Amino acid sequence: MSTTLLWFSSVIGYVIQTKCLSNIQSKKEISVGPNGTIATPETNGDNGNSSSLTFYLTFMYFASWLLLVPASRLWEKMRPMFVSDSDSNRNSQFDNNNSGSVTNEDVDTFSHVLDDPQPRIPAQQQKQKIISVATFKYVAKLTVLALIMIVADLTYNMALSLSPAFDVALMQNTAIFEIVTLLYGVCGISRKNYVFRNFLIMMNAVIGILIISYTKATCDMLAGKLSVNPNTGELSDPFLFDRLKGALICGLGALIMGPFAVLWNRWFCSNISKNENSAVVLVKQSTHMALIGIIGMVILLPFIPKFPSRESVESISLFYNDKSFWFSLLGSIIFGSLPSLISILELNRKAPAEYLTTCNLGAIIFMGLAEWVCEPTQTTIVRWEVIGYIMLTVSLLVLSVTLGEGKYHH
């Protein structure tokens, strides 16, 4: 599949995931009968319940990573339907010459666990192979990445419970774009071509984001979401401090994705050959992600929120019995998280590492379009907001061309 289709898949998947999770977090009442409703645990505000839904959504997000392995194997079988002729010839040549070679030492550590060993080795030798220095190093790497993802995803879900989906997407993707671009340059992962020109284009993109965020309050006021105090002339926003807190939490939590991106490329992408079968690489990296998900769930288990009252347990049970909750959750996983993660893994192999930062700019643009499509009567567009989107789109197109040069760089 081309990098363009993978790019759209990752961006649209992120938008679907964010909109679905925001729909769950913003739900204030649950229908319990023909005419009856009950407040959600988040609305009740009992001690221990204010973050219970955020915690469970984070836990379920890590659980969805277990589906990456079967999804990648399904993609491996369906891949001949989508690859181009050049990709097919390159992969067939590799299969004939190097089908048995594996260059990733960390995957070799668990190769006898993930696949059937050929030939089979005695149980004692297999046990000694599992308990080795390489195994502990591999588990330590996965644990570090799992801890980073726990912080990033908890802050992401917490921000969605406080702020609208667009505000969260704007803050998170801006922070990730800036920190990843900075660390890729400092750590020598990104290329040194056209550095000053790319810097000017990135500054233009950041200015466009600034204009969009600055005019957002004006758009909300014209749409009736905000009002003006007639006595003071100031905007009256009852959720102002929640929005500010959500933006701060999301922005700071997203910064940790910079070290995650650097460590992932150092540990699991540096040894990938451009001639290695992409389907095999995808299965290996999906296995890494699934193991990170398992470790993340294990770390989260001791911190399961406790409900202080019987009413809290009943409201949680009713919430999970609500069909819209499961439809939104399954939609965020099947049409959001899985396609986005698989596309990001493929893009990270096919294109230069810094090319992935364009997905963050695209997510902001498509999130704005999704808000306009889903809420046309509550969305008002002003001239300066359009100018901001134009600046951001032009920067995205130029960066996609300049950063996307040199495919199959690994």
Curated annotation (Swiss-Prot):
Q: Which UniProt keywords apply?
A: Endoplasmic reticulum, Glycoprotein, Membrane, Signal, Transmembrane, Transmembrane helix
Q: Name one Pfam family in it.
A: CSG2
Q: Which residues lie on this side of the membrane: Lumenal?
A: 18-50, 162-167, 218-245, 306-324, 375-385
Query: Which parts pass through the membrane?
Result: 51-71, 142-161, 168-187, 198-217, 246-265, 286-305, 325-344, 356-374, 386-404
This protein's major location comes to endoplasmic reticulum
Q: Give the subcellular location.
A: Endoplasmic reticulum membrane
Topology of this chain in the membrane: Multi-pass membrane protein
Q: Which GO terms describe its cellular component?
A: endoplasmic reticulum; endoplasmic reticulum membrane; fungal-type vacuole; Golgi apparatus; mannosyltransferase complex
Matching InterPro entries: Csg2 (IPR031581), EF_Hand_1_Ca_BS (IPR018247)
What domain of life is recorded for the organism? Eukaryota
Residues bearing glycans:
N35, N49
Biological process terms from the Gene Ontology for this record are: endoplasmic reticulum calcium ion homeostasis; glycosphingolipid biosynthetic process; intracellular calcium ion homeostasis; mannosyl diphosphorylinositol ceramide metabolic process; release of sequestered calcium ion into cytosol by endoplasmic reticulum
Residues on Cytoplasmic side? 72-141, 188-197, 266-285, 345-355, 405-410
Q: Which terms in the Gene Ontology molecular function aspect does this entry carry?
A: enzyme regulator activity; intracellularly gated calcium channel activity
Cleaved signal peptide residues: 1-17
Its biological function?
Required for calcium regulation. May regulate calcium accumulation by a non-vacuole organelle. Also regulates the activity of CSH1 and SUR1 during mannosyl phosphorylinositol ceramide synthesis.
The annotated subunit structure for this chain is: Heterodimer of CSH1 and CSG2, and SUR1 and CSG2.
Identification of the protein by name: Mannosyl phosphorylinositol ceramide synthase regulatory protein CSG2
| Organism for this UniProt entry | Saccharomyces cerevisiae (strain ATCC 204508 / S288c) (Baker's yeast)
High-level lineage: Eukaryota, Fungi, Dikarya, Ascomycota, Saccharomycotina
